[in-house]
Curated annotation (Swiss-Prot):
Native organism: Drosophila grimshawi (Hawaiian fruit fly)
Cell compartments where the protein resides: Nucleus; Chromosome, Centromere, Kinetochore
Name used for this protein in its record: Kinetochore protein Spc25
Spans traversing the lipid bilayer: none
Gene Ontology biological process terms, A to Z: cell division; meiotic metaphase chromosome alignment; meiotic spindle organization; mitotic metaphase chromosome alignment
Similarity section: Belongs to the SPC25 family.
Gene behind the chain: Spc25
Coiled-coil intervals, chain numbering: 74-107
Keywords of this entry: Cell cycle, Cell division, Centromere, Chromosome, Coiled coil, Kinetochore, Meiosis, Mitosis, Nucleus
GO CC terms: Ndc80 complex; nucleus
Protein function: Acts as a component of the essential kinetochore-associated Ndc80 complex, which is required for chromosome segregation and spindle checkpoint activity during meiosis and mitosis. Required for kinetochore integrity and the organization of stable microtubule binding sites in the outer plate of the kinetochore. Participates in SAC signaling that responds specifically to disruptions in spindle microtubule dynamics. The NDC80 complex synergistically enhances the affinity of the SKA1 complex for microtubules and may allow the NDC80 complex to track depolymerizing microtubules.
Domain of life of the source: Eukaryota
Known partners and oligomeric status: Component of the Ndc80 complex, which is composed of Ndc80, Nuf2 and Spc25.
Signal peptide (UniProt feature, chain positions): none
Length: 209
């Protein structure tokens, strides 16, 4: 009887142990399933975050490239503006100098006109020399219309109508008129002296006096 009781007790203990093992296995299985589920969700979240990070990093890279490009462009524009300002200042100085020379040249034209009785159209200079020369002793006037480069024809005309000194001064004046009108791209200096041209003998009596 005692032996049967012991056997029954051992069987009950084994049954309880088996039940505890099954319960423990179920608990472990549930925890394992939950762990794997959480791990999968975490991996998915990490993957999404990684993709977002890559997109954000690519966007930041593009923005940095854009900023660098704009910075370089802004620097280039500023350098170009500074260069253009310098060119404009140089051209303005050239224009002012040419204008001063032109005014002085026009004064010279008037002086030579009065001295030689030759009156020209300033707007035709320097391409052509157009106007009239008055021969008061002969009571007549002669029109002239010469190409600005025809120095031989001009020399012949002035030699016949006026003194050799006046002829040379008119040729110098015409050459100077071409010299003081450089193009805007010409960086050379114009070194023409107008005052030297009018050094003719104005004390001599012109033909109309």
């Amino acid at each position: 009887m005692t032996e049967q009781f012991d056997t029954r007790r051992r069987l009950m203990a084994m049954f309880r142990n088996e039940m505890r093992m099954e319960k423990l296995e179920n608990t472990i299985a549930k925890k394992s399933t939950k762990f794997h589920t959480n791990s999968a969700a975490l991996m998915t979240t990490i993957d999404l975050q990684q993709r977002k990070f890559e997109k954000l990093n690519a966007l930041i890279t593009r923005r940095c490239e854009d900023i660098n490009t704009r910075t370089a462009f802004t620097r280039a524009v500023r350098e170009k503006l500074a260069e253009e300002r310098q060119k404009n200042a140089e051209m303005q100085a050239q224009l002012e100098k040419a204008n001063d020379e032109r005014i002085e040249q026009m004064d010279c034209v008037r002086t030579l006109s009065d001295a030689s009785n030759t009156f020209i159209n300033p707007s035709a200079l320097p391409a052509r020399l157009k106007g009239v020369t008055v021969l008061r002793e002969e009571g007549r006037w002669i029109s002239l219309d010469y190409d600005g480069d025809d120095l031989k024809g001009l020399s012949t005309f002035w030699a016949q109508a006026h003194s050799g000194s006046a002829s040379q001064k008119w040729q110098q004046l015409l050459s100077m008129d071409k010299a003081i009108m450089p193009t805007l791209n010409d960086k050379g200096n114009v070194n023409v002296s107008v005052s030297s041209i009018i050094e003719i003998d104005l004390t001599a009596s012109p033909s109309h006096k």
